[in-house]
Regions:
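Single conserved hydrophobic/aromatic residue that forms the stacking wall/gate
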Residues: 1-15
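Long, distal/terminal scaffolding or interaction modules
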Residues: 13-184
Length: 184
């Protein structure tokens, strides 16, 4: 769902929507978490943030992707939502959800990318979301960590105007590689 609110300012109303997080997976079945909603747009204020991805079920399943941040014409783009975590236990792979991308802005700052979700015991961490483009770019989100066996998620790229890229997530303790650092 999406949460709406309206702020009255002297020159008119500023309408903003904020993404709401995805539903969690079932606690007993192999269900994956739902994706987070995208943030709404804004003319001059900070746009709505993307909702966080839902966590996976207890045994199997992957985390949901974070929602993308909203676009802002003259303000700051919304931040991307965090990816949901993979399942806690079980013998099958549970991947972390990808982080949402930061929202763009024409004249303001881009939003920051969301962090990738942490993997379950087995599986890969989610990739971080890209930073939003703007006069100053948003930061890329960090990649999610793997736990026992699996690769860390890759860090998100910075926006086009430069900025800080996200760090890669750590690989699994037993087997797996670290995620790659995002590009600037």
């Amino acid at each position: 769902g999406i949460r709406d609110f309206c702020l009255s300012r002297g020159l008119g109303d500023v309408y903003k929507r904020q993404g709401v997080g995805g539903n969690a997976g079932s606690l007993t079945l192999n269900a994956s978490g739902g994706a987070g909603g995208s943030g709404g747009s804004s003319l001059s204020g900070k746009a709505g943030a993307g909702g966080a991805g839902g966590s996976a079920g207890l045994f199997y399943g992957s985390g949901g992707a974070g929602g993308n941040g909203g676009y802002s014409l003259n303000g700051t783009g919304g931040d991307g939502g965090t990816g949901g975590a993979g399942q806690i236990t079980g013998l099958r792979s549970g991947f972390g959800g990808a982080g949402g991308a930061g929202g763009a802005s024409d004249t303001g700052a881009g939003g920051n990318g969301g962090a990738g979700g942490k993997a379950g015991l087995y599986g890969n961490g989610g990739d971080g979301g890209a930073g939003g483009d703007g006069a100053t770019s948003g930061k890329g989100g960090a990649g999610g960590n793997a736990v026992v066996i699996g690769n860390g998620g890759n860090g998100g790229n910075a926006g086009k105007a430069g900025g800080t890229a996200g760090a890669g997530g750590a690989g699994g303790l037993v087997l797996g590689r670290d995620g790659q650092h995002g590009l600037t």
